Design a protein with these regions (language model features):
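A charged helix-plus-loop insertion that forms the helical arch/lid used to bind
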Residues: 96-110
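N-terminal, polar/charged subdomain of small-to-medium soluble alpha/beta proteins
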Residues: 2, 7-97, 113-140
Length: 140
């Protein structure tokens, strides 16, 4: 959590990938081809509106190269897919001491509900495929 941020809100870390997959107990639980690996952190004050705004922003984000090599295309433009993985450590507060606290993270039941809601929203916005990790699992 960056110091000085006034309000905590749903966060996503995006990694452009040519292919990604996540496994639980040696079995693949989700995968995607060219597109994004999305690590999603859900905070206590988050709601469906936050998930809607973030999903729409990600779907329209122009970070893929066009024919001239300029980052000018969205995941929709390149026919990409996404893999969404819950990542509560994005909600960590590192400001005091050397041990992070997670007091701002949403309770597991709420976080799981919003993670599923966000994933479903991405399925609507990104028709070429959305894979998922398993909420709360030790993912590999």
């Amino acid at each position: 959590m960056p110091a000085g941020r006034a309000e905590k809100e749903m966060q996503a870390v995006l990694q452009r990938v040519s292919r990604a997959e996540v496994s639980v107990n040696g079995r693949v639980s989700g995968s995607c081809n060219r597109g994004f690996l999305i690590l999603l952190g859900v905070f206590e004050g988050d709601g469906e509106e936050d998930a809607d705004l973030l999903a729409e922003k990600i779907a329209k984000l122009r970070v893929f190269a066009d024919e001239q090599g300029k980052m000018n295309k969205s995941i929709l433009d390149v026919g990409g897919s996404v893999l969404v993985v819950s990542q509560f450590t994005l909600c960590a507060n590192y400001v005091h001491g050397n041990r992070p606290d997670f007091f701002s993270a949403a309770e597991p039941e709420k976080a799981n509900r919003l993670y599923e809601y966000f994933s479903e929203r991405m399925r609507i916005l990104v028709p070429n495929g959305v894979g998922n990790g398993v909420f709360g699992a030790d993912l590999q």
